[in-house]
């Protein structure tokens, strides 16, 4: 248990289910109070209640479409009103759309970039304002596709490469507050294949097979959401107090 995360206020986007929900559980297990933000209004309320009941921490469900900057500003204003501060942000909301590049329609391209990159930027912006001089930690979720793209997912790869660059820029901008003592640390995790419902649906649809996944991974299996969440908890904790501007590849090799 990382005691320095107890009673911290942690804002997690895309946390109604999947990887984001696993993140929320891991931080709650450390004693953090969780703001669960997700576009799925009913589901995020259910998830917030489940975590509060299981871990005995405070939770706050927020319906949030991260592609909307006004909605992001409003969500962080609600956090300020409720808690008065923010200690950790995890940008987990994201989508991917498969389509050959020669046929990719503009509206789908915009949707991927708006959620994955614009949403991440403006959530970081508002978190940075709320964290202020007290400092904090931001963990962005990138992807192995940011450096090893696969066919048919060009906008996704572009968006995640942008997340990597954003992570490094913000780490440089926000690393010198009060001689670094109260800096805002900004890091990213670049997972590979994760056994989430989204990927398992792809397996069932025949888009990719487990054998194909195992063939390219030295570890010979997909990650569990909990394994990626453990990395996020580490990066947000004081154990990683000298780690910033890094893109950590948690991809099984």
Q: What do the predicted segments below correspond to?
A:
Residues 176-181, 193-216:
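A glycine/serine/threonine-rich, flexible loop-to-helix segment
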Residues 124, 159, 167:
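Active-site helix of classical SDR
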Residues 102, 148-154, 220, 238:
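Active-site loop immediately N-terminal to the catalytic Tyr-X3-Lys motif
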Residues 143:
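Residue(s) in the substrate-gating loop at a strand-loop-helix junction
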Residues 100-101, 105-113, 209, 213:
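Substrate-binding pocket helix/loop in short-chain dehydrogenase/reductase
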Residues 175, 180-185, 243-245:
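Short, small/polar-rich loop/turn modules that mediate ligand/substrate recognition or access, typified
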Residues 221-250:
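C-terminal substrate-recognition "lid" of short-chain dehydrogenase/reductases
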């Amino acid at each position: 248990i990382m005691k320095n995360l107890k009673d911290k206020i942690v804002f997690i986007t895309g946390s109604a289910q999947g990887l984001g929900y696993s993140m929320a559980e891991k931080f709650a297990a450390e004693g953090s109070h969780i703001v669960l933000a997700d576009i799925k209004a009913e589901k995020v309320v259910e998830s917030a209640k489940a975590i509060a009941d299981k871990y005995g921490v405070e939770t706050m469900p927020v319906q949030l479409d991260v592609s909307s900057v006004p909605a992001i500003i409003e969500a962080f204003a609600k956090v300020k009103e409720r808690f008065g501060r923010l200690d950790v942000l995890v940008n987990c909301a994201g989508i991917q759309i498969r389509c050959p590049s020669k046929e990719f329609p503009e509206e789908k391209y915009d949707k991927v970039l708006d959620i994955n990159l614009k949403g991440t930027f403006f959530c970081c912006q508002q978190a940075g304002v709320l964290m202020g001089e007290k400092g904090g930690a931001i963990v962005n979720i990138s992807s192995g596709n940011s450096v090893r793209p696969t066919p048919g997912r060009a906008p996704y790869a572009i968006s995640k490469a942008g997340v990597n660059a954003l992570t490094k820029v913000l780490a440089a901008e926000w690393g010198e507050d009060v001689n670094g003592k109260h800096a805002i640390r900004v890091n990213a995790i670049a997972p590979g294949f994760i056994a989430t419902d989204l990927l398992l649906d792809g397996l069932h649809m025949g888009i990719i097979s487990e054998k194909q996944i195992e063939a390219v991974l030295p570890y010979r299996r997909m990650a569990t959401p909990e394994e990626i969440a453990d990395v996020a908890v580490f990066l947000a904790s004081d154990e990683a107090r000298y780690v910033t501007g890094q893109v950590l590849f948690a991809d099984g090799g």
